Every structure is written in structure tokens, then in C-alpha cells.
Design a protein with these regions (language model features):
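Unchanged
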Residues: 1-203
């Protein structure tokens, strides 16, 4: 499990949260955990943070390995944003902000805890690969519905109204269940022009 952070200070908070959970047996001890701040203290966004994760994985394996990702199942949670809308969580980041749910042991849950629980069924569905999540959106799905028989990259998406979708990322289907275009935070008009909106006004 790899978390990304915007800077070293945020990364230290994330590391302390993970260490606390490990010491209290609230995370699997045989899983490797890493927290990677944006390189050189410069904000690189989710794309740059993903490349940073890939570099980290390659460096862990050394230069002799042909494919450093072979046989690995990696969960990346991008969590390097500032908590501007909820500044009370800017220190610990949105990822460790509480959610209105009590865990079986009686403690309050956080987005991070929900991600770990929700994604725990994914490794059994894939032999190897990397699942990338946005740390401020709790996406719940049934891992049994994942079709892991693919090459390259795959995306998990949900149908949503265009009024919601225009504020997020929208995949344009090529008609054969492949992504032909990714439209990020586009106007409703542009989404309609591109053919991304169906007859029910959903994307």
C-alpha cells in the first residue's frame, strides 16, 4: 500500500497514522507500506505522483529486474491534496479524516480505514497490477464484478448524472467497452458535444 503526500510534513503525519495502526494490530503486518511525498517539495499532481510511485517500486527491486511490477499487487492512494474545504483536517489530510461509521472494535473510522476494508477483496481478483485511488473519494464496489482479464490499464467507473460528472473525470466509451478519451472537469455542453452523455443525461 503506497500513499502519496504533497510534502514531507504531510508524509510524516501519514507515516505516524500507519505506524499507530500497525502497532495496534489494525493493519496486516505482512503488507509493505510506503508514503511518498511529492519530489523536491514541488507539487506534481496525481499524474506526477503516479510516476513517482513507479520510480519508487523500480528502485526497490534494483536495476537487474526485468519487470519490477511482476507478481506485485499494489494499492496506491493519492492523498497529496490540501484540505481547503475542511481545513480542520489539513494537518492529517482528508485521507485520515473521520467518517460517520464505527468499526467493529469500537473506534471511529477514517477514509483510509474504509479504503483498506473496501479494497481488501481486490487482490484475490488480480494476479498482479496496480490499483490507483483518489484519497478524497470513497468508491465502494463489489470486487467480484471486476473483470481482471485485460492487458494494460483498466478503469473502474460509475454512471452518474452529467451535472455531477462535469466536476470530475469522465471516460468516453469507444463503443467496445474501451476508453477512447478521458475528459477531466469539462462543461456539460462539451461533454454532450463529445458524445459522453447518454439518453438519461448520465456520463
Amino acid at each position: 500500500i503506497i500513499l502519496t503526500a504533497s510534502n514531507e510534513a504531510q508524509a510524516e503525519v501519514y507515516r505516524s497514522q500507519i505506524e499507530y495502526r500497525l502497532q495496534n494490530h489494525r493493519l496486516p503486518a505482512d503488507t509493505h507500506y510506503a508514503v511518498l511525498p511529492d519530489p523536491e517539495g514541488k507539487r506534481v499532481g496525481s499524474g506526477g505522483a503516479t510516476f513517482n510511485v513507479m520510480r519508487y517500486i523500480a528502485q526497490q527491486e534494483g536495476t537487474d529486474v526485468g519487470n519490477p511490477f511482476k507478481g506485485k499487487r499494489i494499492l496506491v492512494i493519492h492523498s497529496g491534496g490540501d484540505s481547503k474545504r475542511v481545513p480542520q483536517y489539513s494537518v492529517c489530510g482528508k485521507l485520515f479524516s473521520p467518517v460517520p461509521r464505527e468499526l467493529p472494535d469500537g473506534r471511529g473510522s477514517t477514509l483510509f480505514d474504509e479504503f483498506v476494508i473496501g479494497m481488501s477483496g481486490v487482490p484475490s481478483r488480480i494476479r498482479e497490477g496496480m490499483l490507483i485511488l483518489s484519497g478524497d473519494v470513497l468508491l465502494l464496489f463489489n470486487p467480484l464484478q471486476i473483470d481482471a482479464m485485460f492487458n494494460g490499464a483498466a478503469a473502474i467507473s460509475i454512471k452518474e448524472s452529467v451535472t455531477t460528472g462535469k466536476n470530475h473525470g469522465v471516460f468516453l466509451n469507444d463503443g467496445h467497452d474501451q476508453v477512447s478519451l478521458f475528459l477531466h472537469k469539462q462543461s456539460e455542453e462539451h461533454l454532450r458535444e463529445m458524445g459522453a452523455v447518454n439518453e438519461h443525461s448520465c456520463v
